[in-house]
UniProtKB/Swiss-Prot annotation:
It comes from the Eukaryota. Residues 1-11, 502-513 have a biased composition (Polar residues). It comes from Emericella nidulans (strain FGSC A4 / ATCC 38163 / CBS 112.46 / NRRL 194 / M139). One of its GO terms (cellular component) is Atg1/ULK1 kinase complex. This is Autophagy-related protein 17. InterPro entries: Atg17, ATG17-like_dom. Keywords: Autophagy, Cytoplasm, Membrane.
Length: 557
């Protein structure tokens, strides 16, 4: 709109001059004044524009601060999550490794215990042959010669180790389950966080430009907010300028009416109830108020003061400007309304983005606070429980390995007992065979000696008969004696080398007449054996063959 500043002159044109020159009548000027006054209600939009700019700047400042805080928290959050899941993986690895080692140890224990039980079963099944034991004794198995208290004590020790390991494993499992509950809560919080972020991102995409709406960023960008604030400031500035043009138009209308005959009272009446905030000052963008022309103050200060005189040409020019501007005033008001509508929309977008940043910050802060609480209070307990299990398992693992070695040693001992018994059977059979060979040699020697003896006796007797009458009896004292006799004596065997002797074995037995082989029944050498303390059992051939088969089978394994 254009405006013409009033200048100094005196007087006002006559109504007749208005008719002569075709100027609008007073009623038309008054209608323009009323319309100009009505257009000044746009001041409310200008004031609102000022509020919008202030709110937008505040929203931008808050968004910048909150975005920076969110970025810092997100960095810490990512580090905490990474650390948390690393700890959980390590704790789970400890549990799985311990469980696997424990299962392998139990498997080895079960196998060793099964071997031991099998060996003990064989000891129970192996009955000592009656010829090895005193006559009349109840039958005994090899197991009767074994003291199982060592096995029972070993089983008790292993059971205690297994129970302690199971208890430690149960405590670790309970701790890990609680840890998993914590992780599940964190996942739920992260789901809420992602939903909030997604919603905020969608809002940012709708409100941002086309190039930004296609961004793959998971967070709304703050880069568009300064340009929006700047656009609001430009709108507010332009609205203030438009309002000033409306005020100038109103001022011209007031001046024109006052310079028209009979218009002073009308001007006074119309300007008496101006819209609030119009008179005194005009708002400007970016500040609380800006100074402007004081219409009502100047008009009411001295209503009887003389008007500055105007020439006819000046008056006509003023009226012409008013008529032209009156046609544009409504468009100016519409433009102000359009601009305030646009500003409200932009402010809504800014506010939505600010709220999105705040929502993301609150969600991030909630997750971060939960993780911080977990890391400072409960996480050390989960880690300590894993360390406690490791310490218990290391101790018990050593005990279990020692017990496993003891089980293997016991099994080897009892298995050796079985082999030794089979060897004893073989040894008895061997000794029996040797004794038979000795007896055979003795019998053969006895027979040969007896034959030689009889032969010698007969020869001596023949010599005595044939030559004895011719030889004096004292020529050789042995001439008439029988030949010497050879007798075999049994002597009890002493202890083998390396075997300690008992006191009653210190004196070796001496032979006497009852111990002479010549007085023994050659058909029953065992009677002589019993008198000399060496009884060699007469074992069945089947028993010996079974023992040989078992030993041969073990050597081939």
């Amino acid at each position: 709109m254009s405006a013409v500043d009033s200048s100094t002159s005196s007087g006002h044109p006559e109504r007749e001059a208005q008719h002569e020159t075709g100027l609008p009548p007073l009623e038309t000027l008054i209608s323009h004044l009323v319309a100009a006054k009505r257009s000044l209600s746009a001041i409310n939009h200008v004031w609102r524009a000022n509020e919008i700019v202030t709110s937008a700047r505040s929203a931008l400042e808050e968004s910048v601060v909150v975005s920076a805080r969110t970025g810092f928290l997100r960095s810490g959050l990512n580090n905490q999550l990474r650390l948390l899941y690393n700890v959980r993986a390590e704790v789970e690895e400890i549990s799985l490794r311990g469980r696997s080692e424990f299962a392998n140890a139990l498997k080895s224990l079960d196998a060793a215990d099964a071997r031991l039980k099998k060996t003990l079963g064989l000891l129970r099944e192996t009955i000592v042959h009656a010829s090895f034991r005193p006559e009349g004794e109840e039958p005994k198995s090899l197991h009767d010669f074994v003291d199982e208290r060592g096995v029972e004590e070993l089983h008790s020790t292993l059971k205690s180790s297994i129970d302690r390991t199971n208890a430690a494993q149960a405590d670790l499992d309970a701790s890990n389950n609680a840890f998993d509950v914590e992780l599940q809560s964190i996942k739920q919080a992260l789901s809420t966080y992602r939903a909030t972020t997604k919603l905020a991102s969608s809002r940012g995409s709708v409100s941002s430009s086309g190039s930004q709406s296609g961004s793959s960023s998971s967070l709304p960008s703050i880069s568009s907010m300064p340009s929006m604030v700047h656009s609001l400031e430009m709108h507010a500035q332009e609205m203030a300028n438009l309002l000033e043009s409306l005020v100038r138009h109103f001022d011209l209308c007031v001046t024109a009416v006052k310079h028209t005959e009979g218009g002073g009272a009308a001007a006074q009446s119309i300007t008496g109830d101006m819209p609030a905030g119009v008179m005194g000052s005009h708002p400007g963008p970016g500040h609380g108020a800006g100074t402007g022309p004081t219409i009502e103050g100047d008009f009411n200060a001295n209503p009887n003061a003389p008007l500055d005189p105007l020439s006819a040409s000046e008056y006509r020019e003023m009226v012409s400007v008013i008529v032209n501007d009156a046609a544009e005033a409504e468009d100016v008001v519409m433009e102000i309304q359009d601009r305030i509508g646009e500003m409200e929309s932009v402010l809504e977008t800014l506010t939505a983005q600010r709220d999105s940043f705040a929502a993301i910050y609150n969600a991030t802060k909630e997750v971060f606070s939960y993780l911080s609480s977990l890391a400072s209070t409960r996480l050390p307990g989960y880690i300590a429980q894993a360390h406690a299990f490791t310490a218990v398992w290391n101790d018990e693992h050593d005990r279990i390995k020692g017990g496993l070695a003891d089980l293997s040693d016991l099994n080897a001992l009892y298995d050796g007992f079985l082999d030794a018994y089979d060897g004893l059977i073989i040894e008895v059979a061997r000794r029996r065979h040797v004794r038979h060979r000795v007896e055979k040699i003795l019998r053969d020697a006895r027979n040969k000696l007896d034959a030689l003896y009889e032969e010698d006796v007969n020869a001596r007797e023949t010599f005595r008969v044939e030559q004895g009458d011719y030889l004096p009896s004292d020529i050789w004292p042995g001439l008439s004696r029988e030949p010497m006799r050879v007798e075999f004596h049994r002597i009890s065997g002493g202890p083998l080398k390396g075997v300690l002797q008992s006191p009653d074995q210190a004196q070796s037995p001496q032979p006497n007449e009852g111990e002479q082989l010549g007085h023994q029944d050659p058909q029953n050498p065992g009677d002589a054996d019993s008198r000399f303390g060496e009884v060699i059992p007469d074992l069945p051939q089947e028993l010996v063959e079974q023992a040989l088969a078992r030993l041969k089978s073990k050597r081939q394994r």
